[in-house]
Swiss-Prot record:
Its EC number is 2.7.4.22. It comes from Anaeromyxobacter dehalogenans (strain 2CP-C). NCBIfam families: pyrH_bact (TIGR02075). This is Uridylate kinase. It comes from the Bacteria.
Length: 251
């Protein structure tokens, strides 16, 4: 939703939530965080902040530890999920550091309280940070096991009244099949929430999609690896795949 300050008339969205996977921070590596990739993402975020758009982020932890994977190897699911949440805090702190190095004031709010490294998640405080032009990174998922960071992103987007949820991936939208494995796969330009659920398309998990559907929150799936794509989406360029109501799709 528009903030108290003057909004940028060029931007389609005035308040966004950008969802990054933990893997997005790895770059070409197989584990951990790539400083080069982190810097590139930080500059992408800064480009949008410079437009006057309010930016919140949620980051996964799969580059460090994935709770579901730990559970399949015999770990207790709740314990594994909490470990995954801690991984998201590490990623959030890394991105905060990268953003502040280029002059973007940033706050990390964690759903699991750890006062030495992050603020506790307080919805009203998060909104106030956004209104003051600060980037807010939501860490530790929802703070509960069995919920993905995609669901956390949907929840936080609703709580802060974001105009859109931007789902950053390594491909330029949603396809009928994995384009890396199937050259004949075709990209969807627009999808309804029901299409995503019925076709079991790998946009986000069903809980996250249902939450967005119930609250009319549009989702844009796009390629983060192309520098400048976040800005393009915010300015309304038709890239990636938009998920929303059928009426919006057919407009």
């Amino acid at each position: 939703m528009a903030s108290e300050k003057a909004s940028n008339p060029k931007a389609r969205y005035q308040r966004i939530l950008l969802k990054l996977s933990g893997e997005a921070l790895m770059g070409d590596g197989k584990y951990g965080i790539s400083p080069k990739t982190l810097t590139s993402i930080a500059h992408d975020v800064k480009d949008v902040v410079d437009l006057g758009v309010e930016v919140a982020l949620t980051i996964g932890g799969g580059n460090i530890f994935r709770g579901v994977s730990g559970a399949t190897e015999g770990m207790d699911r709740s314990s594994a999920d909490y470990m995954g949440m801690l991984a998201t805090v590490i990623n959030s702190m890394a991105l905060q550091d990268a953003l502040e190095k280029i002059g973007v004031p940033t706050r990390v709010q964690s759903a699991i309280e750890m006062h030495q490294v992050a603020e506790p998640y307080i919805r009203r405080r998060a909104i106030r940070h956004l209104e003051k032009g600060r980037v807010v990174i939501f860490a530790a998922g929802t703070g509960n096991p069995y919920f993905t960071t995609d669901t956390a992103a949907s929840l936080r987007a609703m709580e802060i009244h974001a105009d859109v949820l931007l789902k950053a991936t390594k491909v330029d939208g949603v396809y009928t099949d994995d384009p890396k494995k199937n050259p004949a796969a075709t990209k969807f330009k627009q999808l309804s929430y029901i299409d995503v659920l019925k076709k079991n398309l790998k946009v986000m998990d069903s809980t996250a999609i249902s939450l967005c559907m119930d609250n009319d929150l549009p989702i844009v799936v796009f390629d983060l690896t192309q520098r400048g794509n976040v800005r393009k989406v915010v300015l309304g360029e038709e890239i990636g795949t938009t998920v929303g109501r059928p009426s919006a799709r057919n407009a």
